[in-house]
């Protein structure tokens, strides 16, 4: 069975401090994909402390976002509510946290860890689908890491949210050029 890695579909990237374009549509599309395809869902979450170095208040460039345990860090509630097969709903086994270190900006979810201490790269299958938010940042870097590890990646374009459309298109072209397959519909 192939995996679907759902990158950072969290409140702050959907309706919060770093809300992205097409995020609501991406979540709905991903849920439909999960419900109509035989895949194993793996979720990633940005998970920061209040003292994270990427925050403007701490000398970084980003507004405060995805603080561990906050509303902003919560996955979209549609995932546990609307996914039919319970094993594909978010759980401690299939949720991988990244951005835990204050001194490192971690866009890629490749090294994200679940509650059992397993890294995403240790459990992901040889072929993965990827969707989520934001295509130019965490989505792109996660796909790059997966490709560099020798995995086959199918990027689900309708299941992506983005910061800026120009950056989104540029990221898609770059990833396609590096070997990712793009599914447009």
Task: Label each region the model flagged.
Residues 1-96, 126, 151-154, 163-184:
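Active-site acidic carboxylates
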Residues 31-34, 137-148:
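Histidine-anchored nucleotide/phosphate-binding helix
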Residues 75, 119-120, 142, 171:
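Residues within well-ordered alpha-helices
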Residues 89-121:
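Histidine/lysine/aspartate-rich catalytic loop segments that bind and position anionic ligands
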Residues 127-141, 155-160:
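Glycine-rich anion-binding loop/nest that anchors nucleotide
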């Amino acid at each position: 069975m192939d995996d679907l890695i759902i990158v950072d579909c969290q409140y702050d990237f959907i309706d919060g401090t770093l809300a992205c374009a097409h995020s609501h549509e991406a979540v709905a599309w991903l849920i439909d994909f999960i419900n109509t395809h035989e895949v194993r869902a793996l979720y990633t979450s940005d998970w920061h402390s209040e003292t994270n170095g990427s925050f403007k208040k701490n000398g970084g460039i980003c507004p405060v976002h995805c603080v561990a345990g906050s509303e902003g860090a919560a996955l979209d509630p549609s995932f546990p509510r609307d996914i039919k097969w319970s094993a594909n709903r978010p759980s401690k086994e299939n949720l991988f946290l990244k951005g835990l270190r204050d001194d490192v900006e971690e866009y890629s979810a490749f090294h994200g860890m679940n509650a059992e201490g397993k890294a995403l790269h240790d459990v992901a299958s040889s072929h993965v689908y990827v969707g989520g938010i934001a295509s130019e940042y965490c989505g792109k870097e996660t796909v790059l890491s997966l490709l560099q590890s020798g995995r086959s990646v199918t990027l689900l374009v309708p299941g992506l949210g983005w910061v800026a459309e120009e950056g989104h298109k540029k990221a898609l072209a770059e990833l396609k050029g590096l070997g990712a397959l793009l599914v447009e519909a």
